Amino acid sequence: LRGELERVWDAGTSTDPDGWTSENPARGHCTVAVLLVQDEFGGRILRGLVGGLSHFWNRLPDGSDVDLTRDQFVVWHVTDVEERSREYVLGTAREDGLTTRDRYATIIRRLADLRDVERRPIR
């Protein structure tokens, strides 16, 4: 999943379009990533502060944590961890008003297109 996401993430799907780079493709994608992980594997969504910035990751039903976007941070020190609902995450928006729901829908479409292209026979 992470490899596929790196192929469909861009500045437009990041919560930080000005800070996003191809060298750090996970930047600003934690909200859409946690929704996709929850779609695939279930579990809970956790939120904490990393360097004063809000960050989300997943806790799977077996108790293990999955964070597809942790590497966007140089220093990893999490505080104020709490569980958040899927509805809460979907209701968030970036500064220009583009909602996580809209960014999530874009990523879902791109993943479907990517997977469809990869399944097509070579002619």
What do the PLM-derived regions correspond to, one by one?
Residues 1-123:
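A structural boundary/capping signal
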